[in-house]
């Protein structure tokens, strides 16, 4: 949820050469770093007595909420002013992190929700995007392509395909009115957007209807107009009118207040290409040949009875995934229709493939015992003489019957086999890098399968819902920790 790369926390970022090692408590130095890396916090708390300004920040549970706060300036761009978030139904920084009482923060009376949007600044007007209209889809694609997500050094920029936008924004139950845009009145040019899709999630067993907020994007020339809070308020109003009072979103910046925080990991599939475009460094003392050899993958998968997922597998995968995700504190509560939409590739000559899903079918019982999936998100390589894009595969959902055996060693072995096959299949599909978070049971295989730590952190947020902090799969040193699993079981695009 942001007009900058930091809102995603997953821009095409370089792996991190050096480990960050923030302490388990928010020290005065770390609190000052938090202010430094979030300009709006610094600006709006700057008028207060320094000790008072830092006191609220020190009350945060750093090990749960801010593990791995980037101290390298990666959090420089703010999604919206800190003052704005003080007016919203979100947990405050100074609330006790151990408060386990879960539930809505504010009860919404739909009769009191405005039927009309707030007025925009002169020269701009609201619009509702029709993504079934090829021209309006192209406008959104154009805005996102040139103004959405870019790395700090302007070397890489996300390149969402139109097929990806259809997949991401037209899931079951999608509403046209939740695809919000802002146009320049005179030119009619689309200059800002925010989108949401409806779904249900479970938070510590409580099933709630939410809107997944995404693609908050503002034209670079309008970043000073403070449109982000206005866009957030407008999508909130439209959701309220449809009876949805909670939302889930992610950001790479620290806002009030993360429910969890995961770290990105990257596994090179074409190391030489990643090195040539500046994504992967050449480690000191190593050589190109050594790095290519280190990241080499077998030509063939090793899991018996592995095959691409088909429409006939939807019910079995739905059952397996639902049982698996129930092990996590926060996760999506999928419907059968959502499984079909999100996981089944429907070949079409007009559309690029976005999702790759595979199942393991027992040849005797024909039961689906395992499945995994990954999706495609390319990045443009800006002004490079040889390469124009990096193809990144993002680990999506997976599940395995082995997870129910109460045998972590067996689960670790099974996931390492499955995920190594995912890497092989992604390599065969011409992907250059495979990305994954420390969510789910990912700490069981990330380091063993030669994923490298990234400098991207993804913070998870709930709007108008309070719950105690949820483990993000990392420890106080921001490293994958098998003892910190079982928290995040949701994947946000």
From Swiss-Prot:
This enzyme's EC code(s): 2.3.1.97
Domain of life: Eukaryota
Keywords tagged on the record: Acyltransferase, Cytoplasm, Transferase
Family assignment from sequence similarity: Belongs to the NMT family.
Encoding gene (name): swoF
Active-site residue numbers: 493
Entry GO terms, CC: cytosol
Quaternary structure annotation from Swiss-Prot or TrEMBL: Monomer.
Pfam family, one: NMT
The reaction(s) this protein catalyses: N-terminal glycyl-[protein] + tetradecanoyl-CoA = N-tetradecanoylglycyl-[protein] + CoA + H(+)
The protein's name: Glycylpeptide N-tetradecanoyltransferase
Single GO BP term: establishment of cell polarity
The organism of origin for this protein: Emericella nidulans (strain FGSC A4 / ATCC 38163 / CBS 112.46 / NRRL 194 / M139)
Protein purpose: Adds a myristoyl group to the N-terminal glycine residue of certain cellular proteins.
Alphabetized InterPro entries for the sequence: Acyl_CoA_acyltransferase, NMT, NMT_C, NMT_CS, NMT_N
GO molecular function: glycylpeptide N-tetradecanoyltransferase activity
Binding site for tetradecanoyl-CoA: 82-85, 216-218, 224-228
Localisation: Cytoplasm
Region: Disordered, residue numbers: 1-30
């Amino acid at each position: 949820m942001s007009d900058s790369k930091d809102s995603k926390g997953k821009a095409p970022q370089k792996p991190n050469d050096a480990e960050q090692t923030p302490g388990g408590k928010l020290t005065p130095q770390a609190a000052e770093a938090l202010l430094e890396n979030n300009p709006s916090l610094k600006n709006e708390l700057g008028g207060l007595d320094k000790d008072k300004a830092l006191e609220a920040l020190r009350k945060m549970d750093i090990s749960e909420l801010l593990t791995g706060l980037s101290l390298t300036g990666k959090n420089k761009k703010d999604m919206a002013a800190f003052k704005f978030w003080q007016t919203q139904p979100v947990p405050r920084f100074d609330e006790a992190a151990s408060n386990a009482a879960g539930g809505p923060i504010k009860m919404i009376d739909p009769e009191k929700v405005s039927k009309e949007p707030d007025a925009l600044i002169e020269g701009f007007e609201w619009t509702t995007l029709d993504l079934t209209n090829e021209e309006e889809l192209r406008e959104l694609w154009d805005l996102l392509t040139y103004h959405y997500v870019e790395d700090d050094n302007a070397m890489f920029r996300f390149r969402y395909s139109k097929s990806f936008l259809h997949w991401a924004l037209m899931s079951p139950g999608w509403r046209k009115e939740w695809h919000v845009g802002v146009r320049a009145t005179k030119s009619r040019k689309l200059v800002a957007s925010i989108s949401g899709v409806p779904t249900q999630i479970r938070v510590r067993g409580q099933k709630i209807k939410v809107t997944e907020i995404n693609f908050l994007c503002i034209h670079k020339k309008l970043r000073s107009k403070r449109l982000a809070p206005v866009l957030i308020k407008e999508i909130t109003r439209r959701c309220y009118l449809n009876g949805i009072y909670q939302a889930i979103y992610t950001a790479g910046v620290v806002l009030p207040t993360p429910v969890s925080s995961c770290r990105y990991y990257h596994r090179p599939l074409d190391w030489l290409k990643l090195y040539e475009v500046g994504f992967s460094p050449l480690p000191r003392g190593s050589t190109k040949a050594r790095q290519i050899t280190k990241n080499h993958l077998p030509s063939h998968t090793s899991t018996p009875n592995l095959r691409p997922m088909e429409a006939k597998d939807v019910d079995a995968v739905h059952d397996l995934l639902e049982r698996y995700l129930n092990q996590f504190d926060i996760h999506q509560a999928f419907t059968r229709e959502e499984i079909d939409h999100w996981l089944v590739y429907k070949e079409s000559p007009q559309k690029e493939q976005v999702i790759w899903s595979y199942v393991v079918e027992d040849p005797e019982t024909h039961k689906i015992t395992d499945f995994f999936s990954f999706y495609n998100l390319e990045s443009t390589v800006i002004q490079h003489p040889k390469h124009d894009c990096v193809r990144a595969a993002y680990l999506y959902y997976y599940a395995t019957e082995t997870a129910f055996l109460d045998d972590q060693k067996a689960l670790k072995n099974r996931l390492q086999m499955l995920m190594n096959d995912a890497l092989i299949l992604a390599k065969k599909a011409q992907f250059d890098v495979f990305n994954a978070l420390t969510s789910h049971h990912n700490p069981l295989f990330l380091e063993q399968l030669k994923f490298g730590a990234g400098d991207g952190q993804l913070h998870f947020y709930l709007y108008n819902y309070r719950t105690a902090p949820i483990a993000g799969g990392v420890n106080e040193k921001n490293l994958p920790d098998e003892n910190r699993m079982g928290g995040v079981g949701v994947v946000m695009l």
